[in-house]
């Protein structure tokens, strides 16, 4: 039964109302510093911890709750007579509810002007110590680190005579240990990232010790293949607009492959300003287009490769309206992603309950790192978020691209970034015409892209081509020109650049070098 609570919070969201409800239930309130003042100013009966322990706060508040009367009251096991006798002997009442959240360390170090001294002063000591004590003794103590749990605790207390059951206490305790682990991980990441701990001149993006924190969203039926087990975890710092923040409106449970392909589709479609549609199969775009609206963009994207689009993942960067929904509903689709769906669109898919509809808010945020597991280790890199600017483009051929060709080239370049290497992408009029992906030789990717367009009945005459990396020989260029391309965009940087540029001049096509490579493995 909860008779006494200790409350000490940095995030004061909802704390006055929560404390008032506790007081109304007859719970005695202990508190510290600013929290105690806030509660007292609200007219609540609260005892300062310094008055409770008989020992004042000291060292600029660094020592407030590190006292046997606090930790003894938290850690004592109520089922052990010797523990309770020790409390009685020393005049220590039990503390049955602990409400604590920590100094805002992560928010502090995120500030551009944060110094090492600022960071150090925002490393909480007393808070984590109390939290861990209470979480360890969760059989007897309820511990709350998240304001979102205030209502849960109150409801259970009201229903059970000021008692919170073991299942809730256990869940809250696990939440505490996860929270303190993440807190310590953030401190370690910060301190081991300092390149000059004395002057605090700068920080490395890659700390000597890397701690990552994820919460499980769900267990998955299986992994990439049925014999593999799997689960999906969300980054605790997932940015706005990230796939992990999806809201599923209908459909079957997402699979491992659904999630992986949906991420590829969403990351690609977000890069376009005009209404766009991206169709993904096995993490590769098989159709990308921009149009007047979602329906128009879909029609053009689907036209690229109708065969591969079967059972694909489709993403839009605009609301899916009834017209777009009716067009998509004619095909077999696994997942449909958009910032929103109109009511009429939802009605269209109501008859197709197996189709998974995901809503994700558009956002500019990106993950801090791109991670890839290798045997016994982890490769960590910054995201490939580089977008070339017009002044960075270099025309290296005698013929310059026309304005229309330039538009097609930039569109093709944007798509190629999301195609598995080696990547060759034919485009024209705001749509992909042929995509060659994942081949060991660039010339084979060029041939496949040409064949794909031919199979779809699309002409490549006058098309633009993007290559994610340089042409090592002129053979790949010869293939795309023979297919009908009149302009090419590529990074350059090959030992044979002069030979490839000479071939472009020989064919009287325009070639642009970006100086940026977009390998994707």
UniProtKB/Swiss-Prot annotation:
The protein's Enzyme Commission number: 2.1.2.3, 3.5.4.10
Biological processes per GO annotation: 'de novo' IMP biosynthetic process
Gene Ontology terms for molecular function: IMP cyclohydrolase activity; phosphoribosylaminoimidazolecarboxamide formyltransferase activity
Domain (MGS-like) ranges: 1-145
SMART domains, sorted: AICARFT_IMPCHas, MGS
GO cellular component: cytosol
UniProt-listed InterPro entries: AICAR_Tfase_dup_dom_sf, Cytidine_deaminase-like, MGS-like_dom, MGS-like_dom_sf, PurH-like
This protein's record includes keyword Hydrolase: yes
The family this protein is said to belong to: Belongs to the PurH family.
Domain-level remarks: The IMP cyclohydrolase activity resides in the N-terminal region.
Cited HAMAP family: PurH
Protein name: Bifunctional purine biosynthesis protein PurH
Organism: Burkholderia cenocepacia (strain ATCC BAA-245 / DSM 16553 / LMG 16656 / NCTC 13227 / J2315 / CF5610)
